[in-house]
Amino acid sequence: MNLKVLKKTEDELRIEFEGERHTLLNLLRSELLEDERVVIATYDAKFPIMDNPVFRLKTRGVDPLDVIRDASARIADLCDEFLREYEEAVR
């Protein structure tokens, strides 16, 4: 996965996700929308087969890089928890 920052301000971030589709972006969007620091978390892919999606994050005056990093860490923790539970269940 390649990421390209298209825009970065004090409270807004636009990132192009090269080669990604809905699965990861929906998960990231859902996690970000649970954060009270987030005003907008959305993405758009004009032509899903040909275009790379662009993710937009707007915060309440907080550095969007910190917010997206925190959300990514929560997602990683959730995946770790799932893996532990799964391994325990299939023993």
Swiss-Prot record:
It holds the Pfam family RNA_pol_L_2. Its EC number is 2.7.7.6. It is an enzyme of class 2 (transferase). It catalyses: RNA(n) + a ribonucleoside 5'-triphosphate = RNA(n+1) + diphosphate. GO terms for molecular function: DNA-directed RNA polymerase activity; protein dimerization activity. GO terms for biological process: DNA-templated transcription. Keywords: Cytoplasm, DNA-directed RNA polymerase, Nucleotidyltransferase, Transcription, Transferase. Signal peptide: none annotated. CDD domains: RNAP_L (cd06927). GO terms for cellular component: cytoplasm; DNA-directed RNA polymerase complex. It is found in: Cytoplasm. It comes from the Archaea. Belongs to the archaeal Rpo11/eukaryotic RPB11/RPC19 RNA polymerase subunit family. Part of the RNA polymerase complex. HAMAP family: RNApol_arch_Rpo11. DNA-dependent RNA polymerase (RNAP) catalyzes the transcription of DNA into RNA using the four ribonucleoside triphosphates as substrates. This is DNA-directed RNA polymerase subunit Rpo11. The lineage of its organism: Archaea, Methanobacteriati, Methanobacteriota, Stenosarchaea group, Methanomicrobia.
